[in-house]
Amino acid sequence: MNPLAPVLTIDGPSGAGKGTISRIIARRMGWHYLDSGALYRAVGVAASWADIDTSDASALVRCTFDTHVQFVEQGESMRVMVNGTDATDELRLETTGALASAIAAIPEVRAALKERQRAFRELPGLVADGRDMGTVIFKDAPYKVFLTASAEERAERRHKQLKDKGVSVNFDDLLREIMARDARDAQRTVAPLKPADDAVLIDTTGIGIDDVVARVMDLLPVPAA
């Protein structure tokens, strides 16, 4: 970790566009990228593979330390390796997202992952995508953004994404899952989902990716040539 490296935090609920926007900006700036949600999902997948009960906090903490996560860029996409296995597709499942949300509510797990996330802070800079990047992990980040969108729009985006991948899912079920996750994330006692006091709020409902990227880029220094 390099405390001198600038950090842009992009927080927000599931489906607000954090991942897409963060990856684009990281490429444009030439900065490192942290998908904190993928870390929680990776621990969830590893725990599932090991048949660990999500109520067993001590076992989950051990799993957190034992799980090796690697981000591998493939063209425009990012593959996530969990203990040497490509778990990208499994990490994107709604069931995995729900599992990650449940695990994220456990204080011991969040504490175990805190330093692993901070270790991504290196020069020339870092774009950190998550739910508590600006409020907990990188409180001193000079650039903070909170993306949001209506639950309906986020469900529509996710529904289209899954449909394009050939995955059949009921829209109403998807909407209910997203709303339930929103409630869990906002109501947990440790690091609840909320914008940092100094974050710039951007509602992406009805706004294209290019427009959102432009708004965020306006907050940052001119990228190095």
From Swiss-Prot:
Reactions performed catalytically: CMP + ATP = CDP + ADP; dCMP + ATP = dCDP + ADP
InterPro entries to which the protein is assigned, alphabetical: Cytidylate_kin, Cytidylate_kinase_dom, P-loop_NTPase
Residues in coiled coil: none
EC number per UniProt: 2.7.4.25
GO molecular function, one term: CMP kinase activity
Top-level class of the enzyme under EC nomenclature: transferase
Main location: cytoplasm
Localization, UniProt: Cytoplasm
Residues where ATP binds: G12, P13, S14, G15, A16, G17, K18, G19, T20
HAMAP family per record: Cytidyl_kinase_type1
The protein's name: Cytidylate kinase
Species of origin: Stenotrophomonas maltophilia (strain K279a)
Source lineage: Bacteria, Pseudomonadati, Pseudomonadota, Gammaproteobacteria, Lysobacterales
Gene symbol of the encoding locus: cmk
